[in-house]
Regions:
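Conserved class I S-adenosyl-L-methionine
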Residues: 1-42, 46, 50, 54-57, 160-185, ...
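Conserved Class I S-adenosyl-L-methionine
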Residues: 3-10, 69, 193-294, 298-319
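Intrinsically disordered, low-complexity terminal tails and inter-domain linkers enriched
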Residues: 34-60, 104-108, 288-318
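Class I SAM-dependent methyltransferase SAM/SAH-binding core
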Residues: 61-120, 144
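A short acidic, Gly/Pro-enriched loop at the edge of an enzyme's catalytic core
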Residues: 118-129
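A short SAM/SAH-binding and catalytic strip from SAM-dependent methyltransferases
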Residues: 128-142
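A short glycine-rich, Lys/Arg-flanked "PGG" loop and its adjoining helix->strand segment in the class I
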Residues: 143-158
Length: 319
């Protein structure tokens, strides 16, 4: 997709409503990568095991691709990891850096850099965990994105990607608006393609990974229906491009009414608020073969401050 879809607007007004999903995805991925330690023989309490797990996390290198305003990157840092968040949009990176100032001294480290999911500015095997929450789904050439995620993740490391499902409410928002512009050309990629396990399997074909997928849900809540509609119609991304085209054709108000009707149909709030459960597909992919899997967390990786802040060519996005 075109990077200018993400210029301006207010992403956080909409995106913050589901940002807590990043906490769940990050916790799940870190637990799969570094399972909680059990008390070793001769150690009497689980406190020692908890400290062992925390120590292991201190050496865990995490890459958040399409970091946006940084919810997943910050969640990983709060868990003690050493994190790099990558995005193409300067405004979102500024928001992420501002929010990183709220990390505690006892948390891990995080750095946010400009970069493209199609050409990540890191050496091979750099990270223990590469994750993306509703980020890489917006990048073009998904097979190339998968290859890049595998390339920068060490053998035995993990890839975790969360993406909206096509049939869920979040996957239906863009089509609900887009249909007022007429049918899209055959073969036009959709961000919700990442919510289809069969497509994911085809993208990873030939790459050294084993993976599983499962559907999870996140409760999305806004103060009211009107707040939700306003948040989405001003949110940067493909929807705003559709809105501009519909306004030019004087059809936006019809599309806006359909968007409001979609939200109302899925509303689960028992007050004046709007709340709905949004399903997403969680992909967990293990890189490399078991024989190559290290038995301990990888150490000796470069510090986040040493990683290059390379601005990739414009024209595609990781978020």
């Amino acid at each position: 997709m075109r990077n200018n879809d993400w210029h301006g607007g207010d992403y956080t007004a909409a995106g913050d409503a589901w940002a807590h999903a990043a906490d769940d995805v990050t916790a799940t991925a870190l637990a799969a990568l570094t399972p909680p330690a059990l008390p070793a023989p001769g150690r009497e309490t689980t406190a020692d095991a908890t400290r062992d797990t925390a120590t292991a996390r201190r050496t865990t290198r995490v890459l958040d691709v399409g970091t946006g305003s940084g919810p997943a990157a910050l969640a990983a840092a709060r868990a003690g990891a050493r994190v790099v968040g990558v995005d193409l949009e300067p405004g979102l990176l500024r928001t992420a850096r501002s929010r990183a100032r709220g990390l505690a001294p006892t948390d891990g480290t995080v750095r946010f850099v400009a970069g493209d999911a199609l050409a990540l500015p890191f050496a091979a095997d750099t990270f223990d965990l590469a994750l993306s929450t509703f980020g890489v789904m917006f990048a073009p050439e998904p097979a190339k994105v998968c290859a890049e995620l595998v390339r920068v993740t060490r053998p035995g490391g993990l890839i975790a990607v969360a993406s909206w499902t096509p049939s869920g409410i979040m996957g239906r928002i863009a089509p609900t608006v887009r249909r007022h512009l007429g049918p899209e050309p055959d073969g036009t990629p959709s961000p919700t393609d990442w919510g289809d396990p069969a497509r994911i399997s085809s993208w990873f074909a030939g790459l050294p990974v084993t993976f599983e997928t499962r559907v999870e849900r996140v409760r999305v809540r806004y103060p009211s229906l009107s707040h939700a509609v306003a948040a989405f119609e001003n949110k940067p991304g493909p929807l705003r491009r559709h809105r501009a085209a519909l306004e030019a054709a004087r059809r936006w108000q019809h599309a806006r009414a359909d968007l409001a009707a979609l939200f109302a149909l899925h509303n689960r709030a028992d007050d004046d608020a709007l709340a709905f459960d949004a399903p997403y597909l969680l992909l967990l992919a293990r890189v490399g073969t078991p024989s190559r899997t290290p038995t301990a967390p990888l150490t000796g990786l470069p510090d986040a401050a040493d990683l290059p802040a390379v601005r990739a060519p414009r024209g595609s996005r990781a978020h």
